[in-house]
Amino acid sequence: MGRSPCCEKDHTNKGAWTKEEDDKLISYIKAHGEGCWRSLPRSAGLQRCGKSCRLRWINYLRPDLKRGNFTLEEDDLIIKLHSLLGNKWSLIATRLPGRTDNEIKNYWNTHVKRKLLRKGIDPATHRPINETKTSQDSSDSSKTEDPLVKILSFGPQLEKIANFGDERIQKRVEYSVVEERCLDLNLELRISPPWQDKLHDERNLRFGRVKYRCSACRFGFGNGKECSCNNVKCQTEDSSSSSYSSTDISSSIGYDFLGLNNTRVLDFSTLEMK
């Protein structure tokens, strides 16, 4: 259950206070003291809310209120207290006798804040404005340019280039695409002779002559050039007039697929069975 209302809303006055109401409130508090603000309006014969009576007394009618402008000492004290307490105006008002929290807040927003800005001081942090900007920039750069953090990218990167002129400093930011150098990996798997032998064979076919060597010459037993034996496969023929089967080509052309040319291994496919 909540608290019961301090007064009936139907029979309470709202709006500006009259002089008669001020006199009743002042005379009652002088005679009986502040007491309980909930029961004070009925005792004083006022058709007002207890909160309205309290604010009227504290902000306008109490005898120790200071009237007039704030002094320089009060300005300095408000600035020091605001740097320590922030926007806690009720606590600041306790340090300034005769001043209310509402009065101090209004004076801060209308005078003191503008005074600090003219001096180049940030009213929120009470530091120089340039220092706060540089600290924010350094904090942002430290967050983005952390040496322990490395950014991995698989696409084109953008590099910022700043060009400065001699006569006048002109900063121009251009973005140039930096192409990444990746290894050209061929992951295709196939069984075929080396590409050097293919180029050599295509070059020989292009000039119209193909040289065939026997197995002895291919394994190093021959002279390594044109064979002097009477084997048909070792003769030099024109590619246009020669007709040979696929088995002759595979057995006669010197492909070094498994590196057998450097080893002394006999070609059992050319041996005749007796």
Curated annotation (Swiss-Prot):
The induction text for this entry reads: By light, UV, cold, drought, ethylene, jasmonic acid (JA), salicylic acid (SA), abscisic acid (ABA), cadmium (CdCl(2)), high salt (NaCl), and cytokinins.
GO molecular function per UniProt: DNA-binding transcription factor activity; transcription cis-regulatory region binding
Q: Which Gene3D superfamilies match?
A: Homeodomain-like (1.10.10.60)
Subcellular location per the Swiss-Prot or TrEMBL entry: Nucleus
Which PROSITE patterns does UniProt cross-reference here?
Answer: HTH_MYB (PS51294)
The alphabetized UniProt keywords are:
DNA-binding, Nucleus, Repeat, Transcription, Transcription regulation
Indicate yes or no for the key word Translocase: no
**TM ranges:** none
Q: Which InterPro entries match?
A: Homeodomain-like_sf (IPR009057), Myb_dom (IPR017930), Myb_TF_plants (IPR015495), SANT/Myb (IPR001005)
Q: Give start and end residues of each DNA-binding region.
A: 37-61, 89-112
Keyword Protein biosynthesis found:
no
Listed under GO cellular component are: nucleus
User: A Pfam family matched by this chain, by name?
Assistant: Myb_DNA-binding
Indicate the segments forming the HTH myb-type domain, all copies: 9-61, 62-116
Region span, Disordered:
123-144
**Tissues/organs with expression:** Mostly expressed in roots, and, to a lower extent, in stems, flower buds, and siliques.
Quote the CDD domains the UniProt record gives.
SANT
Q: What is this protein called?
A: Transcription factor MYB32
At the highest ranks, the source species' classification is: Eukaryota, Viridiplantae, Streptophyta, Embryophyta, Tracheophyta
